[in-house]
Amino acid sequence: MIGIPIKAYTQHVKYDPKCIETGPRIWNKITAKTYARAIMNAQHPTWGRNEWKALVKLWGKESAWDATADNPDSTAYGIAQILNTKKGTPAPLQIERGLAYIVHRYDKPSIAWAHHRKHGWY
């Protein structure tokens, strides 16, 4: 669960209608991971395999990589379980915002994952 204002980490990740799936693509665990890996490698080329593994574990624990995961105890929603995310937010946007949040708050996934292991949230 994430508790900082959305605008702090969505400032540079604006809604882009091109993110919405226009064809038969179904966002599932595999397509979400594939997209996240591509975005992570493009935006953070120095992050290696360990950072990817940490991200897989972190979001696996938070949502099982389910773009429709809904936390009944908070406003957290989606793959990254970001607070105040509207239901129906496209999976690519969830992933981009989740990575932006991790960079903003923790610098990289391994630190976010360590925090999650200690506190049960990130």
Report residues per predicted region.
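Peptidoglycan cell-wall recognition and remodeling modules
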Residues: 26-122
